Design a protein with these regions (language model features):
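Mature catalytic core of soluble alpha/beta enzymes
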Residues: 3-258
Length: 258
């Protein structure tokens, strides 16, 4: 986004997304940063062919939130090669905008779902809570609901799931390269944390938090969650060759359907 050094005035959507990204970034210890786009492109996850051996150190010179500032309503970048990537928020934010539109027509009970990013309110046709299936995160699972690990009750708010089991490839050495990039190292954030589901007041917030936890990796994400008593998360982690381990935060437990 924006390959010039200075932009025209940013609109309210960009301003909101940037503010939310900064809020999540402050929680992440440097693992969540929307200036990650040059790295995403180099690893082949932005519609470009992956570089065989990306020059990560050189690219990192153009990554870092401190390299972008807002000045008189415009984005100003330290270098024109700095680029912003709001993909970790945009789908959730779009869901929120659609939910707002639905409510403007007077709907009291609804669900908006774009590719697993969900915002809902009220109850379903049977008068019960909305039930959201969380996929089993085996590599290449494109079944769209055929393999469900858990179901979650939701009556009001947003829900988003992030995972590295769909968008990935194996490099020349057989190593898994997933689309979630750690902006500190410039490399794929692959760990035994396979899937992250977050419930939050808005889908945009849930979307961004899910990406943050995934980028942190299993150990750091679990440690972070334990310092956030109100966060609602469901983690699926690899356990051995084919097994799974689950972590459900105390605030999420009542939402899990057994």
């Amino acid at each position: 986004m924006y390959k010039r050094q200075e932009t025209d005035s940013i609109d309210r959507h960009i301003a909101f997304n940037l503010h939310l990204a900064d809020s999540i970034g402050a929680l992440s210890g440097g693992r969540y940063d929307v200036t990650v786009k040059p790295l995403v492109e180099a690893w082949g996850f932005a519609g470009r062919q992956a570089e065989r051996h990306p020059d990560v150190d050189s690219i990192l010179a153009f990554v870092g939130r401190e390299k972008v500032r807002v000045e008189e309503g415009r984005l100003v970048k330290a270098d024109p090669r700095v680029q912003l990537d709001f993909n970790s928020i945009a789908k959730g934010y779009t869901v929120d905008l659609l939910a707002r539109l639905v409510e403007s027509f007077g709907a009291r009970n609804y669900i908006v779902d774009i590719g697993g990013e969900v915002r809902c309110k009220g109850v379903n046709r049977q008068g019960g809570p909305w039930r959201i299936g969380i996929e089993t995160p085996f590599d290449g699972n494109m079944s769209d609901g055929e393999y469900v690990q858990k179901r979650i009750r939701l009556t009001d708010g947003g829900l988003a799931t992030s995972g590295n089991y769909r968008r990935f490839y194996l490099d020349a050495d057989g190593n898994k390269v997933a689309h979630t990039i750690d902006p500190r190292t410039g490399r794929s954030a692959v760990s035994r944390l396979l899937s992250v589901t977050v419930a939050a007041p808005t889908c945009a917030e849930a979307d961004a938090l899910g990406t943050m936890f995934l980028a942190m990796g299993a150990d750091d994400a679990l440690e972070a969650v334990r310092t956030m008593p109100d966060v609602k998360v469901y983690f699926i982690l690899a356990d051995g060759a084919d097994g799974y381990e689950e972590y459900i935060s105390p605030a999420m437990e009542a939402m899990i359907m057994q």
